[in-house]
Amino acid sequence: MKYIKVVFVLLIVAVVYACATNPFTGKKTMAFVGNDQLFPSAFAQYNQVKSESKVITGTSDAEMITRVGQRIAAAAERWLVANGNHGYLDDYQWEYTLIESDQVNAWCMPGGKIAFYTGILPIAANETGVAAIMGHEVVHALANHGQQRMSAAYLQQGLAVAGNVALASDDQALGIFNQSFGVVSNVAGMLPFSRSHETEADKVGLILMAIAGYNPDEAAELWKRMKANSGSSSTPEFLSTHPSNDSRIATLQELAPKAKEEAKKFGVTSFRPIN
């Protein structure tokens, strides 16, 4: 019993002290892995992906990805500085890569390494659509969502170990715990946790694209195209790490006017044409 208490105390101490501050909410978040470890690992993975992929350079699409990325990064810098987060991006090493692939995918690694796959460009449809995707993915990195997911996974593993230690003398209870813990912790904890990241990335991503001069109204149109591309098959929202397409579209439509108001604070009163 004494050992069990020690395990739980160590978990509590880890959660309390291993924290970082989300620059968009000001709230403390779990950070068992620091940027000094996370960024080099992300950069190495990025270089590996590039070495194993067909990277497109010198085309109008590749130039667009870089152009939009630079504008979103500049918007993020302006927004962060205006909200008191000076120097937050000092360790970022922005890079923008277009990869030839049918995958409908794009991502931004911790530290600012961004990849777009050609398969997502028809759904983006235009430069403003690319900006909507870019803003969303950049926020995942800036808000430390990857770091939080890794930390939550470590905590989940720690709780599983603690549960096994606590129930080691009761085979029946231990069996029930191991059968149910993964499902319960995912549905009640990890999945809503991931959905909250998606919602935050949508909200702040709209602001960044608006500050960069792109019309945030296009984000909802992008997700209508994404919904059409995904067809009728969809996972129930409570079992998904992402909000449903309909929920996301409604949220984006509601938040777009607020993003425009935020952009006005940075002198943005009109947006680039959508074409």
Question: What are these model-predicted stretches?
Answer:
Residues 2-8, 17-275:
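A Zn2+-metalloprotease active-site environment signal
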